[in-house]
Amino acid sequence: MFLPAGSQDEIGQTVDNRSKAYEIFRQVMILRNYKQISTPVVEFADTFTNEYAGMNLQNMLKWFNREGEIEVLRPDWTTAIARALVKQHPSELKWSYQGSVFRRDKDGIESRQAGIEIVHTPVFLGEGESLLTAVQYLKELNIADYLIELGHTGIFDELTAPLQLSDQELDQLREAMHDKRRDVVFTIVNGKASKEQADEITAMVDAFGSFDVIEEYEVKWKDNPRLLEIIKHLKKLATLLTERGVKDVSVDLGRVKNLPYYCGTMFRGYLKETGATCFSGGRYDKLYEQFDESISAVGLAFDVDVLADHLHIEESYERICIIAEEASHAYAEELRHTFTNAIVDIQYTDKDKEKFDRVFKVIKENDEYKVVEQ
Amino acid sequence: MKPTIALTKGRVEKQFLKFFASLSYDVEPLINKGRKLRVETDDFLFVFAKGVDVTTYVEHGIADLGIVGEDILAEFQPDVYNLFPLPFGECRMALAKEKGKEWPEGKRRIASKYTNITKEYFKQKGESVEIFKLEGSVELAPILGLADGIVDIVETGTTLKENGLVVTDEFMHFSARCIANRSSLKIKRNELAKVIEAFQRGLTVK
């Protein structure tokens, strides 16, 4: 029997690591006062493809139901949770979730995520809490070598506002910025504005780095109140992270949103050893506009598969084998519970004894069971 | 760890080495590499691969930078930073048919290595066509009757001419480009900055 491309069976360490990553996540969430939420794995496609969510139907696993409507396997948590949260009382502010998403545009059809959504919360508090939750979770996973990058959708919006680009031109420019394709960025802007404006926007392609970039643009944008407000906001978040011991914080001022619902700060975490993205997220108040709600909303999702791959779990349990037989199985089971904090297995033969640190055998003497260490 | 650069084998490789040498990098080990597909220099690790494989290595972070034709990027749309054009490997995408033959009145049959580009080209024109995917020598398809025309890259036009084909439309202009892995550009910024700046200086000089 074969599996479809992108699907796979997993055994042993991979599954152990993932379970561990989920366990630690749940523990961190409890201690940081998050409430768990889960949404169904099957949803209507429109939840994710409407103009507010803006996801691409082509990348979803989908089918027609009996009424002819398109249903999909959940491709994204944030959108599904927004749908669910509008029915919740606004006093609940912090939500956490864990489970799979299914998309065809990623390696493997199924990927596992764990994440948070914070609603009805002041901007800096919500964003700071999101980032510091990420910092604590990575610390609990013993992951220290990572980079957190901040961006902001408002920079692109502010710089392109005077250009009066059509929606199509705006999409082309956003795509060129996303790919850091400087020649195309320059060409699009130069056709609509002065060379100075084209140079200014093209420079955004290279505007990534640490506090030196923040300070450079604090000076450059000193006469633009909106951009100055954004760069100061990013600086405050970056400072919060460095004060909490994050060694590598950077900004990418040329980063653009890849989904229409992002509207403000964007976050991304990279594992420096492999370059893999271990979390991403940001502000998405706009997502709630589809429900006629004006809500402050921010969150991020961890890629649990990436984190699990990176985990090195030291197994510290002693491994014990009890050799018994059908008649002595109950006695052996009783004996098992006397070994606390050890991995104990009951077997009927000693052929696997090399796999254990200690081996005991249940024997019968004078109609009584006793145990002998081998 | 030295940055890894994936380089497209063949014509792009030769043109790149000339360009790289003009930037005062030592290209001797790269020229005299024999059949080796992995060569370490003082500053970089180079890997040599087919164009589409260069994009795969860069997308998955095996290579930090890649040198590849823009036709490959347009066709396969890899998830990489597509930084800037390089001053070589210039060509254009063209629609061609047999000289002296008219297009059929019905649905046109088009052969190409670049099926995604072809599909998008005719979509923009609002025309439905049958597309045949070929891996090479696309010029044969109209001659042998598989297709009414072809979509392919053209440098000088000599191959088309020698096979009795004429260009009826040119719609994309390409060159070689420098691409980067999305994480590497951020994480290895300092290591990559020097060579990226050198490439850009080379463009200015041109």
Where are these regions (language model features)?
Chain A
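Short, basic, helix/turn surface patches
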Residues: 62-73, 175-176, 279-282, 367-374
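Short secondary-structure transition/capping motifs
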Residues: 14, 66-74, 119, 123, ...
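A structural signal for short, well-ordered beta-strand segments and their strand-loop junctions
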Residues: 36-39, 95-97, 147-151, 250-252
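Acidic, His- and aromatic-enriched active-site or binding-groove loops in soluble protein domains
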Residues: 59-65, 165-187
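TRNA-binding/sensing appendages of the translation machinery
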Residues: 1-71
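Beta-rich nucleic-acid/ligand-interaction surfaces
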Residues: 39-57, 151-161, 255-264, 354
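Positively charged, Gly/Ser-enriched RNA/tRNA-binding surfaces
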Residues: 20-28, 44, 78-89, 95-143, ...
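Cap/lid and interdomain-hinge subdomains that line or gate substrate/regulatory clefts
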Residues: 122, 126, 149-150, 156-159, ...
